[in-house]
Amino acid sequence: MREKILFTEEECKWLLTHAKEYSPSTVSYDIEKKSNLTHIHNSKDRLSEEYGLGKPEGKLASFLLEKLKPIGFINLKGTFLNYLRYYKGGFFAKHIDGPERHKTCIIQLSSQDNYSGGDLIVNNEVISKKIGNTVIFSSNTYHELTKVKKGIRECLVIWTKKGNLKERKVLI
């Protein structure tokens, strides 16, 4: 796991503006054939919202690729973006991402002054809440978001498939 502040506050605001143009997506899990399980991710009661931004294209793709090159992203082919907004009470229980995913990248978009709680924990390590902080880790690593106690926490999540992230000994 590696983390580094890669985005300025202004760039995070730009990403938020772009993300908010999309409609919330439906979160579905194949656990017991149920959808929107509130003990995993409470999007059903709208304490969190997930926006599937799909494959990055145009200005967004160019911008993200340029900013993420220092941590090994050589292209965005085969990647998928999600914008997540967590309100008071919102959380995402400890989990690993789907088997088709190779790397997970999470960009902190909201200021740590805008919310309390909502700690991102990756492999039992609490990740910095500084705006623009970017963390990348193997998608088969356990991670979670603790319950937001007040305010709103926003982030952008990018997943890659194998072959889309240039592996280096020192990514950050």
Residue positions per predicted region:
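Catalytic core of non-heme Fe(II) oxygenases with the double-stranded beta-helix
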Residues: G58-I172
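Non-heme Fe(II)/2-oxoglutarate
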Residues: M1-I74
